[in-house]
Amino acid sequence: MKLDGRRESTNVDDRRGMGGGAKVGLGGIGGLLIAGLIYLLTGQAVDPSQLTGPMDSGQARTEFTQEEQELASFAKKILAGTEDIWTAYFSQYGLGNYVSPTMVLYTGSTQSGCGTGQSSMGPFYCSADQCLYIDLSFFTSMKRQLGADGDFAYAYVIAHEVGHHVQNLLGTLGKAHQQMAKMNAADA
């Protein structure tokens, strides 16, 4: 994916190096989503219970490798692309002004408007603070544990979380959660 010359979003709260320091695993909803994506793309079933990686506390860092810097830049450029597209779409279809989410980059764990976010949860969107949260080491886990490597797979994850933000802005996210709760209650 060629992103040279593309702008980086400024709607980013970079909390990497501020604590947490855990290795990411693909457990929880993130693991299920990625397992489903791999199945759709390859036809191979993946057991989500095997996607959980070990948690390992570490020290906070303020310096990042070249690869980590490039990955953060990539994520900011993908977010900027979603901002441009959704701003134009909202304008074109009379949906009002598009309010961009903030992307929070973190390592290990961080506080969100929805409680404590942990790497093992995978990337997530919190409607309470209109932020999407991602520990960039999730992409390393995607590559290592699922073979899902490359810019398009990484961009998909970010765009997916932005999609939840759009659902929230349009008022459909809450409705979807209500439907899921009804379905879960029916199964109980």
Question: Which residue ranges define each predicted feature?
Answer:
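A Zn2+-metalloprotease active-site environment signal
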Residues: 6-17, 23-24, 28-188
